[in-house]
C-alpha cells in the first residue's frame, strides 16, 4: 500500500497521510445492509465501550473465511476497499461460476489464481490444512475450530508463523507474540494479509475520525469526581491515587484483563508480548 501525502494547503491536508485510494464497486449478491445499533451501549443503554457513535453508513461484504471451494481454481478479478476492516478484499471468480470475496493477500495482483484443498502448492493465497504445510510457513486467516472458518490473523498486515507440529497439534506464533496450539487439521491461508501500511495512516483532522464512528477521547483527569476517579481538584491536580484507575475504579495500566479459567488456557504456551 502506498501512503499518499497531499500538498500543504490547509492544516488538515498538511497533517494527513492516507493510503492510495482503492475503489469499491461491490457485487449486489455479496453485500447486505447492517444496522449498527447501540453505539457502544448495552441493552440498558449504559455505555460499555467508550468513544463510539455516529459514522458513515456501511454495507457489509460477505467474506469467505471458510475457503470451502475445494480443488477449484479461482482468479482474482478485483481488489476493493472494505469499510468494515483495514485489510483490502479481492473478488474471486471460480471455475464453477462461484464468486466470492476473500481477504487480499499481500503481493497478490489481478489475474493471479488461487485454490484451496489438501494437496495444493504452498503458494500465496492458497488455503490448506496445517498438516500439509512445511515448518516456517507464513500464514493468515487461521481456523481455531475445524470447519468454522478463519478467526486468527485477519487484520491488515497480520501474519502468523507455523513453528512446530507434534501429535495432533500444531504450534503457531501469532502476530501478538502469543505462542499457542491448534489442531493440525485446521486450515489457514498462505502469506500475509495485504495493506501492510494501514498503521501508518494519519487522518489529519477530527472529522475524518468521526466518519469512522469514533468519538472524541476525554482524559479522566479533566473530568469531575462523579465521572472519573481521576477527576476533581483545583487546577491541574494529580490523580490523587497510588495507581491509575479505570472509570469504574478498577486498576488500570498493567492489570491482566483476560478472563480466568478459559478452556484455551492449556493451549497457550506463551502469553502475548504486546
From Swiss-Prot:
Main location: plastid
SUPFAM superfamilies, sorted: Nucleic acid-binding proteins, Translation proteins SH3-like domain
Name of the protein: Large ribosomal subunit protein uL2cz/uL2cy
Keyword Plastid (UniProt): yes
Family per record: Belongs to the universal ribosomal protein uL2 family.
Domain of life: Eukaryota
GO biological process: translation
GO molecular function per UniProt: rRNA binding; structural constituent of ribosome; transferase activity
Transmembrane segments: none
Sorted UniProt keywords: Chloroplast, Plastid, Ribonucleoprotein, Ribosomal protein
Amino acid at each position: 500500500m502506498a501512503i499518499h501525502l497531499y500538498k500543504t494547503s490547509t492544516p488538515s491536508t498538511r497533517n494527513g497521510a492516507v493510503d492510495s485510494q482503492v475503489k469499491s464497486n461491490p457485487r449486489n449478491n455479496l453485500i447486505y445492509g447492517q444496522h449498527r445499533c447501540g453505539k457502544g451501549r448495552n441493552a440498558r443503554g449504559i455505555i460499555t465501550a467508550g468513544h463510539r457513535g455516529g459514522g458513515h453508513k456501511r454495507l457489509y461484504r460477505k467474506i469467505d473465511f471458510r475457503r470451502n471451494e475445494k480443488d477449484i481454481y479461482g482468479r482474482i478479478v478485483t481488489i476493493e476497499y472494505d469499510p468494515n476492516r483495514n485489510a483490502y478484499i479481492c473478488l474471486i471468480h471460480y471455475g464453477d461460476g462461484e464468486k466470492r470475496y476473500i481477504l487480499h493477500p499481500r503481493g497478490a495482483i489481478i489475474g493471479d489464481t488461487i485454490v484451496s484443498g489438501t494437496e495444493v502448492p504452498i503458494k500465496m493465497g492458497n488455503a490448506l490444512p496445517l498438516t500439509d504445510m512445511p515448518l516456517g510457513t507464513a500464514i493468515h486467516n487461521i481456523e481455531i475450530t475445524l470447519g468454522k472458518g478463519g478467526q486468527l490473523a485477519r487484520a491488515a498486515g497480520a501474519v502468523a508463523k507455523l513453528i512446530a507440529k507434534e501429535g495432533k497439534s500444531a504450534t503457531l506464533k501469532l502476530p501478538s507474540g502469543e505462542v499457542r496450539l491448534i489442531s493440525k487439521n485446521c486450515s489457514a491461508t498462505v502469506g500475509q494479509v495485504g495493506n501492510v501500511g494501514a498503521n501508518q495512516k494519519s487522518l489529519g483532522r477530527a472529522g475524518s475520525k468521526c466518519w469512522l464512528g469514533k468519538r472524541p477521547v476525554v482524559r479522566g483527569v479533566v473530568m469531575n469526581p462523579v465521572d472519573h476517579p481521576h477527576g476533581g481538584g483545583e487546577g491541574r491536580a494529580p490523580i490523587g491515587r497510588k495507581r491509575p484507575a479505570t472509570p469504574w475504579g478498577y486498576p488500570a495500566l498493567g492489570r491482566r484483563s483476560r478472563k480466568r479459567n478459559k478452556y484455551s488456557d492449556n493451549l497457550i504456551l506463551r502469553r502475548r508480548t504486546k
